[in-house]
Amino acid sequence: MLFRSPVDLREVTIALSAEAVIGAGAAPASEAASRLADLLDSGAALDRFRLLTERQGGDPAVVDDPALLPRAPFISEFPAAGSGFVSRIDAREVGFAAVELGAGRRRAGDAVDPAVGFEVLVRVGERVSERQSLVRIHARSEEAAGRALDRLESAVALSDSPPAPAGPLVWKRVAGR
């Protein structure tokens, strides 16, 4: 079974990867994105990910069975305080909350806990109801989840009306090629 990603994640991943391919001289700009899409669609990219996982000492079976990944012992939900539209999700603040859980580093030598983190369950522009879960928090303890929840409360905003449509995912190429 091939991994299926949200369309927007696929789009930005291909755009960023195409820049690397072009920069390395592996393909001209006119072909890079379509070659990468073919690698994703054929499963070749997933095969390469399995190989890289194994060569870095990981278990390549997790690619096909994510249940083998470490699990956080405490899972909680961040519910909407009211009804409305998700008008903002501050990625920077979500990132700080993730570091607070141990999913990121404060300093280069810090360990990263692969079992903790967030599942963001809604998108900007989505209509939500009061108490609907917006984010699922995977933490080592109830206290850690509470600290993350405090940060998430300032990261997610709701409004009574839908936000303006977002612009394109890729605004422009800086590489200049």
Name what the model sees in each region.
Residues 1-177:
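Well-ordered secondary-structure scaffolds
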